[in-house]
A protein has these predicted regions:
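A glycine-rich, often tryptophan-bearing local segment used as a flexible ligand/cofactor-contacting loop or short
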Residues: 283-340
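Short, flexible/disordered intra-domain loops and linkers
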Residues: 133-144, 217-232, 280-291, 318-322
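Acidic (Asp/Glu)-rich catalytic clusters
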Residues: 91-94, 110-122, 156-159
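Hydrophobic faces of well-ordered beta-strands that scaffold small-molecule active sites
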Residues: 74-77, 98-102, 120-128, 162-166
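A short helix->loop->beta-strand "cap" motif at the edges of active sites that frequently abuts
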Residues: 71-72, 119-120, 303-306
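Active-site clefts of carbohydrate-active enzymes
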Residues: 38-43, 113-143, 173-176, 216
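Polysaccharide-binding and catalytic clefts of secreted carbohydrate-active enzymes
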Residues: 1-97, 103-112, 198
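Aromatic-Pro/Gly-enriched surface loop or interdomain linker
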Residues: 153, 159, 181-269
């Protein structure tokens, strides 16, 4: 998300003055992992992220103010490097943007855009882009467009974006009239869906929370690598989030820190989902050594709440267990230490 690429002497000096301790390169290098979303974030890195969110928001607001002074709207493209413009964190609203547009690769990426609050409207840039990799002799842009639309449409039915569009070289699209015709049908279908859905609350069967170390900061971006590209290592995990994007659930994303700060947070939930490999930010890692966390989850289940684990939920070697909720899940992972 760009934080590791946003370090400078000026930034480090400002950061040290604010937090009161010296910045160390290891906070960014992170043993060579560079704080990717699968790493359980350290306190120092979270402090750095919070600092960057505040500083970037102030700088971005200056740009937005200039844009507004010229009588124009300010729209941000949600790209690969956010570097502080976290759309689900409170600092984002202070920027004063009018709109956000982003590329739609599937249902998760659509919800990543449509769930953003504090802007007048949101827009999705659908695929394929009008580039030669698809729009060439023998290419099939209609197939890609159909796959993209059908995949994203599920999420639109839960939380619609306000506008849709495509991007690229128009002269390439003109060489495929059947593609242009299909895009027209997509636009008409979107208008019909939007007119019926906008401003309504879709039916929700249950209230579901995805529990990880990031919470709402990575809402709908869990397990997403390079804009919803397929990776064998995380496909099944990302698929859970993709399923939720169009399912009849009231979905929220909570962190272990949220549970610590609000003892009653789980009271409003029906189901908790913990999905990912052991000792990653998505399952919790060292957070499971905190008795308040494990007891809160156990109490939630004891009182009738559901807990769904995918992969190695609560996975962290500690006190004779790999899965810290083994007694709740009814299963434990064998690692060779219990072969007596």
């Amino acid at each position: 998300y760009g934080y590791s690429a946003s370090v400078s002497p000026y930034i480090l000096n400002q950061f040290e003055q604010e937090v009161g301790y010296k910045f160390r390169p290891e906070y960014i290098i992170d043993q060579g992992y560079y704080n990717n979303q699968y790493r359980v974030p350290s306190k120092e890195f979270r402090d750095f992220q919070a600092f960057q969110r505040r500083e970037v928001a102030k700088l971005a607001k200056e740009m937005v103010d200039i844009t507004h002074a010229c009588g124009c709207e300010a729209m941000m493209f949600l790209g690969d490097h956010w570097i502080g413009t976290e759309p689900f964190m409170p600092e984002f609203k202070t920027i004063g943007l009018d709109a956000v547009v982003g590329s739609v690769g599937n249902g998760s990426t659509l919800r990543l855009i449509s769930d953003i609050e504090g802007v007048k409207y949101t827009e999705g840039r659908f695929l394929p882009y009008f580039f030669p990799d698809t729009f060439h002799e023998g290419g099939d842009p209609v197939r890609e467009a159909k796959e993209n639309w059908v995949t994203a449409r599920r999420a639109i039915l839960r939380k619609p974006i306000d506008r849709i569009g495509y991007g690229g070289y128009l002269k390439l699209a003109l060489q495929f009239p059947e593609f242009v015709d299909y895009v027209e049908s997509v636009c008409n279908e979107f208008r019909e869906l939007y007119e019926n859905i906008k401003g309504t609350t879709p039916y929700c069967v249950k209230r579901v929370a995805v529990l990880n170390c990031w919470g709402k900061m990575r809402a709908w971006g869990c397990h997403m690598v390079h804009h919803a590209l397929y990776y064998k290592q995380n496909y099944s995990y990302a698929g859970v989030i993709e399923m939720l994007s169009g399912a009849p659930f009231d979905v929220k994303f909570i962190s272990f820190e949220d549970i610590k700060n609000d003892p009653h947070l789980l009271d409003s939930l029906d189901v908790i989902i913990n999905v990912g490999d052991a000792d990653t930010a998505h399952t919790g890692g060292i957070w499971w050594e905190d008795p308040e966390i494990s007891s809160a989850i156990r109490k939630f289940v004891w009182n009738g709440g559901g807990f769904i684990g995918v992969g190695e939920p609560s996975g962290h070697p500690y006190q004779g267990h790999i899965l810290q909720l083994a007694s709740v899940l009814g299963v434990e992972e064998e690692n060779g230490f219990t072969l007596n």
